[in-house]
Amino acid sequence: CQFQAHLYYPNFLNRYSQSLGDTGVVRVVMEENIKYPMYGPDYHKRTQYSADLIHQKAMEWIDKQDGKQPFYGFFTYTLPHAELAQPNDSILKGYKKHFFRDKTWGGSEGSRYNAVEHTHAEFAGMITRLDSYVGEVLRKLKEKGLDDNTIVIFSSDNGPHEEGGADPEFFGRDGKLRGLKRQCHEGGIRIPFIVRWPGRVSAGMVNDHQLAFYDVMPTFCELMGDKAFPKKYINKKIKNDCFDGISFVPTLLGDDGKQQKHDFLYWEFHE
């Protein structure tokens, strides 16, 4: 459920792996976590940290790739988010030495999240933890000799939020842009989109091309040489169905003159 998905020490995680023989979603109970309550100080005695577990599975999957077949990995890391929770290891302890105890985040939304003391240290630690995950992914690709022939994209889903009492201005997270998550101003929808493709995407290049995530599929289709993708993936049972995405391959390759652009970006938000 959405509530468990928003916790870093959840009661369960869902798995669906055809390679493991799954025919549907499998609920994996976090046996060590459920020994302790979801609220109160004992919550932090839970040991099965979802972000670490997701990253562990991602690394195991990369380790199985041998370069003989194309592969596609979509790693949906959840760091950082509204809940402030993580192992009290060297990452967090290092930040606790540099950030003061301040107002608590959490405990103010009907006790949806457990409150913590070192809120900014916790948030900084979660960002550093994510950074370490990305570094491990890149090192694993290099270790297996796959890094020069693999496109790596790092991005986010939305701008900064206020859930749980978070302060979007701290760390300069708002980038001085107007708007927050769920809003259509730049602050809500303008996010990092970093691409690493050695020998094809120029290092350090910055481009202001506007795109949305539905542009990723046609981009990958073009890179694979599948030029018929717009006709293949429309629903012929729906009148006037169309393919909204536009490939941004020209932008990646530095050929802005050939880049087709959106007249506008459109999506719907349901929650």
Regions found by a protein language model. Give the residues of each.
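Glycine-rich, aromatic-lined ligand/substrate-binding cores of catalytic
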Residues: 212-225, 238, 242-251, 255-258, ...
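N-terminal sensory regulatory modules of PAS/LOV and PAS-like folds
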Residues: 1-2, 152, 248, 266
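Active-site-proximal cap/lid insertion segments
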Residues: 2-217, 221-242
